[in-house]
């Protein structure tokens, strides 16, 4: 009997051992898939790590600086444009140290002839181009507007003159200041030499072309200013920007030669300052193009105003 009980207990123990072993095996097998399932999760996280990487943007390539200009630029012509040309060329050469600008003041006609002959790059004229000059290939580039001032010797008592009387003075039909309300004093008529842009513009605007009777014909704006200042009874015409306190400026028909009056079209004696080229600006070399670009820049406009001229509208 005792042997049967022992045998039964041994059997129960063996069954329990077998069941425990099976349970452990199943537990191990069940844990394995969890590990395998974790792997894809790690793999799925990888793209997030890649997306989180900082994006390095490429910097835009730096613009290449404009090529430095080297060479010469030759201008010639109007003496009235001296102040403008001197100020503009000095500033331009400071901005472009590789360029040398030369200017000869020979008068508008001579400057345009030199341009047509190909001996200069730009012909300066203080008047509009004539048809014959345009037919030679010269192109009119207006860079500024100038007023022509009528001046008299400082002791003169006349301060205003009509356009009609002014024309008569230059044609010799009025020869004494008393006929204009002034003192009994002969009028000494001073003007520019033939070929001068100032003379051409004055005579054309006053409609006295080839009809003037001059006491003296001088070859520069400065010479006219000095002669009128030192000659009792003298009258002359000069570029507005050179008028100083050595002379008096006359009103014409009651209108003073100011920028406002000129732009409004009220002042009769105004003319363009032209820098003519052979062909259009688009056909010029790089230095000539740079010169005109500079004139049209804010710096160039300030220079135009500083020398007493008006920027074209």
What are these regions (language model features)?
Residues 23-33, 40, 47, 53-55, ...:
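Exported/periplasmic ABC-transporter solute-binding proteins
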Residues 17-21:
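C-terminal motif of bacterial Sec signal peptides marking the signal peptidase cleavage site
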């Amino acid at each position: 009997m005792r042997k049967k009980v022992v045998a039964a207990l041994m059997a129960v123990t063996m069954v329990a051992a077998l069941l425990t072993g099976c349970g452990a095996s199943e537990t191990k097998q069940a844990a394995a898939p969890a590990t395998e399932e974790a792997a894809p999760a790690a793999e799925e996280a990888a793209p997030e790590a890649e997306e989180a990487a900082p994006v390095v943007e490429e910097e835009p390539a730096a613009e290449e600086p404009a090529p430095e200009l080297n060479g010469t630029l030759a201008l010639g012509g109007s003496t009235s444009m001296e102040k403008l040309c001197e100020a503009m060329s000095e500033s331009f050469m400071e901005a472009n140290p590789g360029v040398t600008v030369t200017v000869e003041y020979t008068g508008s006609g001579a400057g345009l002839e030199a341009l047509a002959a190909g001996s200069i790059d730009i012909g300066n004229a203080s008047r509009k181009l004539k048809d014959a000059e345009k037919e030679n290939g010269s192109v009119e580039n207006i860079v500024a507007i100038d007023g022509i001032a009528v001046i008299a010797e400082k002791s003169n008592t006349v301060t205003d003159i009509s356009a009609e009387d002014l024309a008569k003075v230059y044609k010799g039909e009025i020869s004494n200041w008393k006929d204009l309300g002034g003192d009994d004093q002969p009028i000494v008529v001073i003007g520019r030499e033939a070929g001068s842009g100032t003379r051409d513009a004055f005579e054309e605007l006053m409609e006295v072309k080839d009809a003037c009777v001059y006491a003296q014909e001088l070859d520069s704006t400065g010479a006219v200013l000095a002669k009128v200042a030192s000659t009792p009874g003298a009258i002359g015409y000069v570029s507005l920007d050179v008028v100083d306190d050595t002379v008096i400026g006359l009103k014409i028909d009651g209108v003073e030669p100011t920028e406002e009056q000129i732009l409004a079209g009220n002042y009769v004696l105004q003319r363009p300052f032209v820098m003519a080229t052979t062909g259009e600006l688009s056909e010029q070399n790089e230095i000539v193009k740079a010169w005109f670009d500079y004139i049209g820049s804010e710096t160039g406009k300030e220079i135009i105003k500083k020398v007493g001229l008006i920027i074209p509208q």
